[in-house]
Amino acid sequence: MLVCKKLLLPFAFACCGSLFAQNIQNPVLPGVADAGVMKYNGKYYIGGVRTNGDFYVSDDLVHWGKPIHVVSMDNDWTRGSGAGDDQIHANDMFYLNGDFHLYWSVNYWGKDKHAVHIVHAQSKDALGAYTEPNKKTWMDNRIDPKIFRDDDGQLYMYMVRFTDGNTIWGRKMKNPAEFAGEPVCQFASLPDTWETMDNRVAEGPWVMKYRGRYYMMYNANHTSTEWGNYQLGVAEADSPLGFQNGNKYSYPVVGCNQTQLEEKQVDLLRYGRTYAVSYT
């Protein structure tokens, strides 16, 4: 369930004398949810739920221009209400070797036929138009795609599957459009912990590497205002596909707001010499 969608800039790590020392009026971009952010050539690009295939562009993460349409659903496998641009959810994007790559979830549960898949498109320009190199089928039957590139150049995709509740999986990639090997389950939410205050949900994975260690941020519990328990956790591993229940932190690093619920799907990116944290 999508509620109270806003792009927020709540804090940064070791951020002295920077933009984030200012008093920022949040939300900086109302109406955008489950957002992915890319920095390229001094500008920031964001897309996600309710952007309908559009990107917003900013020089400073605070002041955003008008939406620019970059991609439309154009393939042979989506049908009916699940085929509209309003079903472009949970973006991730990055630049590699002359091409921009865009991923999103098609997450439609309707009366005609539901579609729950990950889609990949690419472009020579950051603002598109992005096209799907393979229009015959989808990449994977999961949601919330997030790409991590290790120091050796190896790509991994993290994603969410509806199995034991919402579970987080990782998969090695041959290239930005193809997988190498089978998906590896990372973890589900643990019963009788802060992760299962209501439903069994683990989603929105994001991985970074710091001082030789791998860190995954993820969200647990349900977004619904009926509960208001959606929180952000961290797991720490010694390899990109080594996350498990045993290496999770035992507490959430960003708690819930019982007064005004906001879905916190994390995205991190470098801002100067610091890591800025944004979420929706």
Residue map of PLM features:
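Carbohydrate-active catalytic/glycan-binding domains of CAZyme proteins
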Residues: A21-Y279
